[in-house]
Every structure is written in structure tokens, then in C-alpha cells.
């Protein structure tokens, strides 16, 4: 779903808080992972702020980067927390189980305002995930439509999808 943010999956959650460029760098890389960074207004801007989950939570809670390891996990890294999304294939080809885990330092519950900070953080992340799932359902419907042009290539904005497909093919054809 990270590859499709340009389609407006997160117009209510992430989009208003991202830097005005609203673009994500997908570095050329090999291997079973992808990494997203939002560089801000310019390429040389501080890459350590994706500007979410919510500006009012402060920079110490903003995600620095998202790393996805194919095919089963995604990490959202920030100075004070890590979000771990574990994906387990489900009983059907089009179903899977998603578990969200939030990791904080051992003494985090002793911080002033911990509950007031992490409750909206969880609500924000889980809301964005719901938007992802709705968007992916729409993409799946599009993919299965008789009107879909299956000969069209990926947009440069979908570089991670192409990278994932290359990785799958490499793994399936490895001897």
C-alpha cells in the first residue's frame, strides 16, 4: 500500500501532515526490502522528518523512515517508538492477518503524558492502516476488472511494486 499513497489513500490522515512535496524517495536497491523517506521540500532537506503521525505530538514522535522486509513485515522508525506491522498469509490467497506492535523504551510508561501521547499515536497509525486496506480493496477490484489494461507498466511512483515483483520472480526462479 505504501506504493499507492499518490492515489490519495490517506487524504484525511497522512496527506495533510506530510511535507508539501508529498513525495517519497524509493532508493534503488536490491534485496528483500524497501525503504521510504520523505525528504521535505528539497532533496537536501532533513530526511529525518516524515511529518507524521500528527504535528501536535512533536518531532520526537514523527516517523523517520519506513522499512518493509518482503513479504512479511514493515517497521516505522521514530526517535521514541517503533511500529512493527507483521503480516501472516491467511487461509485464502486474498486474505492475510495483520498484527500491529508498538515498541517503546522500557521506562516509557513513566514519562509525563505517556498515555495522552501514545493513545492518539495508535489511533492515527491504525486509522491510516484502515485507509490502506480500503484503498487496496479498490486496487484489487481494479486489477480483476475486465476493463483493466494488463499491458501497461508501472508508474515511477510505484517503483516499490516493481521492485517487489522482481524480488518475487528472482526468488521463484533461483536454483
Question: Where are each of the predicted segments found?
Answer:
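C-terminal catalytic domain of Rieske-type non-heme iron oxygenases
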Residues: 1-175
Amino acid at each position: 500500500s505504501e506504493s499507492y499513497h499518490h492515489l490519495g489513500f490517506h487524504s484525511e490522515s497522512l496527506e495533510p501532515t506530510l511535507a508539501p512535496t508529498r513525495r517519497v524517495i524509493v532508493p534503488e536497491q536490491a534485496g528483500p526490502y524497501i525503504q521510504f523517506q520523505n525528504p521535505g521540500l528539497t532533496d537536501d532537506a532533513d530526511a529525518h522528518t516524515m511529518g507524521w503521525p500528527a504535528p501536535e505530538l512533536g518531532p520526537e514522535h514523527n516517523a523517520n523512515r519506513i522499512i518493509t522486509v518482503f513479504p512479511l513485515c514493515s517497521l516505522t522508525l521514530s526517535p521514541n517508538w517503533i511500529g512493527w506491522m507483521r503480516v501472516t498469509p491467511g487461509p485464502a490467497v486474498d486474505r492475510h492477518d495483520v498484527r500491529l506492535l508498538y515498541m517503546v523504551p522500557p521506562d516509557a510508561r513513566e514519562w509525563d503524558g505517556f498515555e495522552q501521547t501514545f493513545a492518539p499515536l495508535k489511533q492515527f497509525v491504525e486509522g491510516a492502516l484502515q485507509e490502506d486496506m480500503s484503498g487496496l480493496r479498490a486496487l484489487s477490484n481494479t486489477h480483476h476488472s475486465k476493463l483493466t489494461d494488463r499491458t501497461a507498466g508501472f508508474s515511477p511512483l510505484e517503483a516499490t511494486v516493481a521492485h517487489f515483483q522482481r524480488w518475487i520472480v528472482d526468488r521463484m526462479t533461483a536454483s
